[in-house]
Swiss-Prot record:
Superkingdom in the source lineage: Eukaryota
Annotated residues for binding of Mg(2+) 2: D93
Protein source organism: Postia placenta (strain ATCC 44394 / Madison 698-R)
InterPro entries named among the record's database cross-references: Isoprenoid_synthase_dom_sf (IPR008949), Terpene_cyclase-like_2 (IPR034686)
Protein name: Sesquiterpene synthase 1
Annotated binding of (2E,6E)-farnesyl diphosphate, by residue: R316, Y317
Length: 338
């Protein structure tokens, strides 16, 4: 009796983990979301610098919907600034994917100059956009939130520049190094500062630097980022992009594709569990500060559940098939581009 040889053909699909069922945090959405979404896209498109194809992609992106689930209690002015930043951040992500490390560095200089010196008059498009939302943000953001925003956005550009160098040199980092740099390339950390801004919080550094508060931010960042690596894997593999945890795990541990997807999915579930554990063990700083901390941690939770819901309703990862993928969890792999 002969046995057939195991198949060595390339996989044609992956089954993504069920992270939605593992996340029991309720979804909330800001009542101003439609108006803020429309006006924010109009702001992004101002000047006609985007092609019709890129404009269509931003309509399908639904960044305003994501923002509205992540900052559900924000007043309209704060939500609008947050929507502008989110559209702008996705715009930066798109253009950084097309840049080498020199181009990324030039963008970083334009952005950080506008943040550190808002009285100056930027000449680049990205510098002007940066100044535009920043001068609105600093009208009501606490000094601590402003400082945390600038510092973490600076870290974002340092990490994105390193990512561009790795991409140019064909470097796939080990898992530990990847996790460290991905926590900054995600862009989540400045979004955590926006939680303070959007909710008019004024949290002191001794609270924001507390190990449990930092751990909660890290757990939320990990879930948002690592789940994004799963959801974006198909598009990225079609372009040959290796800055993805699934590729890193395959390379380091010698796993097949589906096993690597499952591995990253387990890490995502562990990050949700870690968030809940830390949330249940928050210390007390007195009634007034405890209320502000509760609002901040709720904001991190909104990011966890909002990002999961949005990932299937946006067209960024699964095109028009997001809700079908959410139901079946099966993703047909795209062919590699020549």
């Amino acid at each position: 009796m002969s046995s057939s040889a195991p198949s060595t053909s390339a996989p044609t699909k992956i089954v993504i983990p069920d992270l939605v069922s593992h996340c029991t945090i309720p979804v909330r959405c800001n009542r101003h979301w439609k108006q803020a979404s429309v006006e924010s896209k109009r702001w992004l498109f101002r000047g006609g610098n985007l092609s019709d194809r890129k404009r269509d992609a931003f309509h399908g992106l639904k960044a305003g919907y994501l923002t509205s689930m992540c900052y559900p209690l924000a007043g309209y002015p704060q939500l609008r600034v947050s929507c502008d930043f989110m559209n702008y951040l996705f715009h930066l992500d798109n253009i950084s994917d097309e840049m080498n490390d020199r181009g990324t560095h030039g963008t970083a200089v334009s952005v950080l100059d506008a943040l550190y010196q808002p009285h100056m008059h930027p000449t680049s498009r990205v510098g002007k956009m940066t100044k535009d939302y920043w001068v609105r943000l600093i009208q009501t953001a606490s000094p601590g939130a402003q400082q945390r925003f600038i510092e973490t956005f600076d870290m974002f550009f340092q990490a994105v520049t390193q990512q561009a160098m790795d991409r140019a040199n064909g470097v796939i980092p080990d898992l530990e190094s990847y996790i460290a740099i991905r926590r900054d390339t995600s862009g989540c950390k400045p979004c955590w500062a926006l939680i303070e801004y959007a909710n008019n919080l004024d949290l002191p550094w001794e609270i924001m630097d507390h190990p449990i508060i930092r751990g909660l931010g890290e757990a939320a960042n990990d879930l948002v980022t690592w789940s994004n690596d799963i959801f974006s894997y198909n598009v990225e593999q079609s372009k040959g992009d290796t800055h993805n945890m699934i590729v890193v795990v395959q390379n380091q541990q010698g796993l097949d594709l589906q096993s690597a997807v499952n591995f990253v999915g387990d890490l995502c579930k562990q990050s949700i569990d870690r968030f809940h554990y830390l949330r249940e063990n928050l210390p007390s700083w007195g009634p007034e500060l405890d209320r502000e901390v509760e609002i901040y941690v709720d904001g991190l939770a909104d990011w966890i559940t909002g990002s999961l819901k949005w990932s299937f309703e946006s067209e960024r990862y699964f095109g028009k098939a997001g809700l079908e993928v959410k139901k079946t969890r099966v993703v047909a792999l795209l062919p590699r581009r020549a």
